[in-house]
Amino acid sequence: MRLPESRLAVLVSLPRNEAALAQAAVRAGADGLKVHTNVRHRASGTTFGPLDAEREALRDILALGVPAGLVVGAAGSVSIAEMTAAREMGFDYFDVYAADAPSTYVEACGPVTPMVALGPGDGPSQAQALVRRGCGALELSTLEPDRYGTPLTLATLARLEAVASAVDVPVIVPSQHALVPDDLALLRAAGAAAVLLGAVVTGTDVAAFGARIAPYAAAL
């Protein structure tokens, strides 16, 4: 997984697979992007189709030349055949909730970094077991959906520190909390390798997208 070595990375989860959103994020200073297939995204309200339906838009986003990861689905919608096809497109990593990942997920990723998202109740022991099974990065899902948009808490920082200190792979924190730029230093100090800005903080409007991302990139 391609991340800056000396600082926290700012990644952006696109609320739609649109090149205009990707371009705005890159201009605002994003180090990488995340796109989706086969899932309904809670925070943005977007339903993403299968790889064939999203392929043209994904190619346009990948053509920007910044590292991009692909969410390959949710419970019951992850297609190993689609993952095999997507490996050839140039994605930096694949991502799925660990609880939704097929047993052959790591092998299906091939040369693409296999990332999995921990559930809100998963801690260091679960993280260690996933790394032992070949996962190359972890997304620390921090909140149940009914708490999305709440401020960063001490409990989340403590959980992040516990997980990050237990594994030797990057730990990425998504903005399920309503993170503010000043939170990035706290996340870095607790062991995060990257923050993943999503719809909770970026919104979904193309016109405002870059302006909402820029303060986080400037805070590094």
Where on the chain are the PLM-derived regions?
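Conserved N-terminal beta1-alpha1 strand-loop-helix module at the mouth
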Residues: 1-67, 131-134
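Active-site mouth loops of central-metabolism enzymes
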Residues: 2-21, 68-78, 112-122, 172-181, ...
